UniProtKB/Swiss-Prot annotation:
This is Small hydrophobic protein. Plays a role in the inhibition of the host NF-kappa-B pathway. This inhibition occurs at the receptor level, by preventing the signaling of TNFR1 as well as IL-1R and TLR3. The gene is SH. It is found in: Virion membrane; Host cell membrane. Interacts with host TNFRSF1A, RIPK1 and IRAK1; these interactions interfere with host NF-kappa-B activation at the level of receptor complexes. Interacts with host protein UBQLN4. It comes from Mumps virus (strain Bristol 1).
Length: 57
């Protein structure tokens, strides 16, 4: 068995781990951003609706 084999295996494992961490991080960030954006949009829409109602009277 060549000496490079375990090193290659370790590198491959590290790359997979890195990929998983990055994917998880991106997923969490996008989920949080999406939820925050939706909440802000709902609040903005509500306040805009209220404002238009107040000004129409």
């Amino acid at each position: 068995m060549p000496a490079i084999q375990p090193l290659l295996y370790l590198t491959f494992l590290l790359l997979i781990l890195l990929y998983l961490i990055i994917t998880l991080y991106v997923w969490v960030v996008s989920t949080i951003t999406y939820k925050t954006a939706v909440r802000h949009a709902a609040l903005y829409q509500r306040s805009l609706f209220r404002w238009s109602l107040d000004h129409s009277l």
